[in-house]
Amino acid sequence: MAEIRSLAGSMLPLARMEKVIIVGSGCAGLTAAIYAARANLSPLVLEGRQPGGQLSTTTMVENFPGFPEGIDGPQLILNMHQQAEKFGARFSYSEATDLDMAGDRLRLRADDEWLETQALIIASGASARYLGLENEEKLIGHGLTSCATCDGAFYRNVPVCVVGGGDSAAEEALFLTRFASKVYLIHRRDQLRASKIMADRVLSAQKIEPIWNTIVTRYIPDDKGEMSAVEMRNVATKEVKILPVACVFVAIGHDPNTKAFAGKLETDPEGYLLVRHLAESKHPGIFIAGDVADRVYKQAVTAAGSGCAAAIEAEKYLSGL
């Protein structure tokens, strides 16, 4: 049987019927947990195998309100976790793997056990796509990132590169011109896939230098484990070069973490869960928060706000049962 853990290390069996189950423990899930717990709903948070969401791999967060000096991502997550637990939220490392919406009850599979819940908040997030190269996990937060808005300001007056060729890559590159001394845009094709207006802006930006028909084949860290350069290969000529950069911004998309809900809930063409009104899904009792439904902003503060909305809407729903 799966277990509920507390920060104190105690273990309890999972209840078979819950008022609220929250899937995910990033900013959205933990904010939902805080609000649901303060409403005396005793939410059960399924953290899964990688608790904390994307912030757990972020070093310094400077744009979350209330921290004028910034705060480490893992510390922010720990603070939110402790706050939720203080009000009565419970946590499990169990991972949601399936959803059954037949009948008048919601049934969620957590590892090897089926749980029933009156309300379900899905805040399972989205995972940035990376290149799958050696040392990738170690370098995330140390000169490798997928968010220029989050990390661009850390790289003032140094060269950086963006990997990708769509609108997201174009937006990242343009944003980084505010800080970096040079922005290399590495794309495996000979022209951008971005919309014409975005492509024109990139190609006319003085600080941006496109590198066409090229892929990154290796990250090169310095002796402190920080990014110092990338190895690139031209896909046409096979020529290999080393490009010194302080940070690599990978902008090749995100994958919403919706495997457990595939074919069960409405999604857009990219797989993001659809929200009908505020945080509500099409199915009664199921609410959605955070990056699993956000294909645009993907910020900690917007995730937290949607987590708040999901918990409040879940409380309203439960009060009407």
List the model feature ranges, each with a label:
Residues 1-20, 78:
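Extreme N-terminal leader/targeting segments of oxidoreductases
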Residues 4, 126-179, 274-276:
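Glycine-rich dinucleotide-binding loop and its adjacent helix/turn
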Residues 17-19, 93-94, 156-158, 213, ...:
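Phosphate-coordination loops involved in phosphoryl transfer and adenosine-cofactor binding
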Residues 18-87, 158, 168-196, 268:
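Beta1-alpha1 glycine-rich phosphate/pyrophosphate-binding loop at the start
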Residues 24-29, 125, 164-166, 290:
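Conserved phosphate-binding and hydrolysis motifs of nucleotide-dependent enzymes
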Residues 84-103, 107-110, 114-115, 178-276, ...:
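A Rossmann-like FAD-binding core segment of flavoenzymes
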Residues 132, 138-154, 251-302, 306, ...:
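FAD-site-proximal beta/loop scaffold in flavoenzymes
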